[in-house]
């Protein structure tokens, strides 16, 4: 039986079409995925992300532990509330999960991990935390709502009290603050400004209803996927998994190579991969009729005349741009164009950076 978040009843009241998403009953859409997508790009939309797992880590050696556990370096986190995006790797350099880590105090950090990887993540973290004496608390008492879009912060702020409004005033991206019952973070998965707000389960439904009344549109998994793909954001299990290097998933920027003497899980394997080269993640744009879909082959000829084949990891029709876009993992040597096989047709595509839309505007 699939689990329900504390907002399940609100979704059904809002007319959601519910689907099983990695063991959770989640809204796919509330009538129109396209309308929900546009609401986030032009105004404000919200997502139930309570299926994600919040893990609190406490102990005097927490920073030391996370410097070993994660490919990015939490030594960069010096201001309370600052967050960092990182891969959590296995010994062969594959991605166990991608996550966000928040720093509060020297002995208190918070992780937010994916729902699909929850059990293996918790097992991995627990196993490696033991020698460091870390106290691990899984915050199943908290729900999480992401409010995203150009007007999202202003609309969400109408629900905050004076102290909460003051706490978030001028807060830069990738920060989080505990203000009363709310943990408010300037993070998201859409390429728009907004907040991800964690709050006690028993208060989630009232907060959701108040956001609806404030003019924030409920949005489902469908719009979440088209928004994140336009923004060039990876989805675990598609752009990366335990067999794929972060170097092949456009996550090279999340690997902190310096200081050279920091030992983190997967470092040795990554250094070999960096030396020998890996595949890379690119963007694809197809303005002709048709839709680029996951797992379609991508073919190209390199400058030396050699033929290569890659694969689309995520593809969709972009509601913002009005044509099809995709992320693809391909061998080195790809030029500005490639061919994608769609059924029995060979379709020309333009090769771009793996990001298409930022703050409502085309990048590609």
Swiss-Prot record:
GO terms for cellular component: cytosol; glycine cleavage complex. The glycine cleavage system catalyzes the degradation of glycine. This is Aminomethyltransferase. It holds the Pfam family GCV_T_C. One of its GO terms (biological process) is glycine decarboxylation via glycine cleavage system. It comes from Escherichia coli (strain K12). One of its GO terms (molecular function) is aminomethyltransferase activity. The glycine cleavage system is composed of four proteins: P, T, L and H. HAMAP family: GcvT.
